[in-house]
Amino acid sequence: MQELKKLPVGFENFQEIRKLDFYYVDKTKLVEQLLENWSKVNLFTRPRRFGKTLNMSMLKSFFEIGTDTALFDGLYISQNEELCKEYMGKYPVIFLSLKGVDGLTFEEARSALCELIAGEVRRFKFLLNSSRLDHDEKNIYRDLISLQGEQETTLATKLKFSLKKISELLYQHYGQKTIVLIDEYDVPLDKAFQHGYYREMVALIRGLFGEALKTNDFLQFAVLTGCLRVSKESIFTGLNNFKVYSADDVRYDEEFGFTNEEVKKLLEDYNLQKHFTEVKEWYDGYRFGNADIYCPWDVINYVDDLVSEAKSQPKAYWINSSGNDLVKRFIDMADKTTKDEIEQLVVGEAVEKRIRLDLTYDEIDNSIDNLWSVLFTTGYLTKNGDVENGMYRLIIPNKEVREVFLLQIRDWFDQVVANDHASTEKINRGFLEGKTDDIQQELTMFLGETISVLDTKARNEEKEIFYHGILIGILKNYSGWAVKSNRESGDGYADILLKPKNPDVGIVIELKYAHSMNELDKACERAMEQIKNHRYDAELREDGRNDLLAYGIAFCKKRCKVVVEKL
């Protein structure tokens, strides 16, 4: 039996993956497409964890002088012998990943950027011994190795011209223009916005990119990647022959993320074909250009788990690899209309929106419409069908992302409940005192505020679980009792048992879903019969609690009916 290749979980270095013989999904067609389409500066925007860094590493390995050409043996690009002969290993390459450029202050972030650039410059120490560089040029190189410790204006100038200078020195040495690869170009802007120095970072990046990409006679071409397409006016002012390829573009639509065929092949290679449906439900659903795309981070992680443990279940790998503050901000800002639209999304329906692909970070929170756009570009939403008149039909792509929305909706509702002390107190006192009108009134108010996650096609049991979660969220905020959920009692499981501080008192609650408002009364009757027939009060009586109230609560959409009986 052929030994299975190791899966590259967490590996983003192409050379490392190939030399260690890890499994590699061939994306080398990207090289061919770049050279055929030819733009001086190319920006690819895709959600995080969609293979951007690995693709950039692959480009570096292909073009850089001195590359090991055997890395590409057997891959798609090796079939194009003429292209490989002309371009493989023929260029100096500058490769920067800006994902680590962060700091609580602008000075800290700038220092991180200086060290990053200096670290890349140190790869070219052979320039110090180059016969093609004169004394002054070698001194310029020495300055670039250490960009720190200068006066403010000197440091700013050196940093601004650093990439242009090193590409000029590389040209002097090789007689060949430089390829510049900048991965995660927008991370410093995102961090700067979060920490309050956005304008300073925009000015820094604009200056650096302007010199490296716009007025650089020693540039062959550049490739940048990021999550957001920051508006050209803020960063890329004046760049000619500048192309942006977003998730909406047909060109390069299969080069980031896995296609259906690639996922099938991967599962076949590990004899896991039977898991295809669940992989598709959980990790597919992204529509890039004309292609249906899976999140590669998820697929690789899940296959790796299955190889280790055959009974592994799908997990939210992509979601757990970063925070999900964006969805939280979106829900926090939602008005009644937006809450209704979120309900549509969560139950699998589409919402039509006009999307802006060129926002700046400081515009994101200006309006709920801008957040719709960012949710699309960052992968929390995807398009369903063709774009018509600038309007996108947006859907949640898969089960994994739906889990994020559900989690954030629950957290948001918990916060709503925690902040409304008067209503929760009224509900809780109502349960203790048998005041069904108070309970019904306040519960209906909360139901009106919440975001329903109920699919109309869901089974009654699933709908009851939803309302059960809402009621538990309200009851657990009251310190006056212990809340027991789905506890075995008598001949079955009671939905909710409440044990107040008074040791003589106990409360049993049974929930039912009604298909129409006319059925609420009958649903309450069924709930009450179930409490009695299955002796749900047994656990409470065993505790010595004999002053018992039983509640039957029926729900229909955002209305409810409450009845009570003394047991």
Could you say what each language-model-derived stretch is?
Residues 539, 543-567:
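Domain-level recognition of nuclease-like catalytic cores that cleave nucleotide substrates
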Residues 242, 294-535, 560-567:
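Extended alpha-helical interface modules used as scaffolds for assembling large macromolecular complexes
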Residues 61-126:
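P-loop NTPase motor core
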Residues 9-18, 108, 112-160, 188-193:
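Conserved P-loop NTPase mechanochemical-coupling segment
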Residues 232-237, 245-304, 341, 346:
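Amphipathic alpha-helical segments of the small helical/lid subdomains adjacent to P-loop NTPase cores
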Residues 179-183, 207, 220-227:
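Structural recognition of the conserved hydrophobic beta-strand(s) that form the central parallel beta-sheet
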